[in-house]
Amino acid sequence: MVQILHISDTHLGKRQYSLVEREKDIYDIFSQLVDIAIKEHVDVIIHSGDLFDVSSPTTNALVMAIKILKRLKDVNIPFLSIPGDHDTPKRKGYLIPHNILSELDLIKILNYEKPYIIKGIEVYGIPHIPTVSKSILVSALSALRPKSSRSILLLHQGVKQILPYDGSWQMELGSLPKGFGYYALGHIHTRWRLTQDDGSVIAIAGSPDIMREEEIEGYEKFGKGAYLIDFSKDLPILSTINITVRPQKVVTINTKNIKKDILTIRDDLIEHNKSENNKPILHIIVEGERMRKDLLYKELLPLNDVALYYRIYKDETTQTVDNLSYTLPRDKGLDKIIIEYLTKYEKFSEDEANLILQMIKNVESDEIVNEILKKLTGVNL
């Protein structure tokens, strides 16, 4: 029996919304995947790119990667990978972070010139090739000739049929070379799989955690985790491995019923947190009439102790203005014009307007801006 764990887009070191907790989540998810590999006695792990979130990962990210990968080495499970776009330096002459792990004999970096052989299965890999170099990708793909269907190809590219936006894809499914039994794709964060007429499988493992809010819908439909591949015969048989991640939710509030909406969300989260250890992240859509941001954030304060983090994801409020016109006076300086506009039309007090003016003048100083925002909203940033 030959078992392979296919994972991708782990983005080690990513600190979503600058939250230390999210960086720890990412390491924990990677560790869980290694736990699964060891428990299932897999013969190899294949990783389809974006092992790290950036091409120059922090010391923390490197140390955690080394610690976790050492556990695989201790039980003789090889870790095969290709660099993704996040792993790849944008300047020539710089090494990918994988080289450090390779020097420590913790991973094998795949290429398309010579396969890695594991129990008779050929494993090829093509590193991420950017859109401007599509011709290089096409050439590399056309040169591949596996000996049999007991073969795997790792890629980290945008695929037109899945990402049909200008500049987001570098290849089409029809460009995949014939003859492989399993095509292990990365780059796209939502799971996807297709069994072709010849029995071969094209599979996107997806990211094992929710890296962006647009992944929430896909997570709710398909889950997050990995694919466990049984390659004992000529063609692969896939099983879906799901893992538990910190929940992220898109919620909607209306400024007309803002207190009621927020309390409803709060009550739901209190109930959720009774059975879950991980407080969720909220992506808030605001509807209704326009509301001053400082007042809006004050209304959101009841969510502070039930959510790890919340943000205004979409502001879909509208402003009703009756015959509003504003002529810039010629006898006043810019400061006075700004103060007058903020107090007369935005209904700020004069003190608040002065604070906003100071924030505008010191926009390049995060420290000053954050201090002023604290005064305006009463929220620690």
Swiss-Prot record:
EC number from the UniProt entry: 3.1.-.-
The keyword DNA repair appears for this protein: yes
Broad enzyme group: hydrolase
Pfam families attached to this UniProt entry: Metallophos (PF00149)
A GO molecular-function annotation: Y-form DNA binding
Keyword Lipid metabolism: no
Activity modulation comment: Nuclease activity is regulated by Rad50.
Positions annotated to bind Mn(2+) 2: D50, D85, H156, H187
Cofactor requirement: Mn(2+)
Cofactor stoichiometry and binding remark: Binds 2 manganese ions per subunit.
UniProt keyword terms in alphabetical order: DNA damage, DNA repair, Endonuclease, Exonuclease, Hydrolase, Manganese, Metal-binding, Nuclease
Positions with a binding annotation for Mn(2+) 1: D9, H11, D50, H189
Domain of life from the UniProt record: Archaea
Any one of the GO BP annotations: double-strand break repair
Active site (record annotation): H86
Family: Belongs to the MRE11/RAD32 family.
Protein role: Part of the Rad50/Mre11 complex, which is involved in the early steps of DNA double-strand break (DSB) repair. The complex may facilitate opening of the processed DNA ends to aid in the recruitment of HerA and NurA. Mre11 binds to DSB ends and has both double-stranded 3'-5' exonuclease activity and single-stranded endonuclease activity.
Subunit comment: Homodimer. Forms a heterotetramer composed of two Mre11 subunits and two Rad50 subunits.
Name of this protein: DNA double-strand break repair protein Mre11
Gene that specifies this protein: mre11
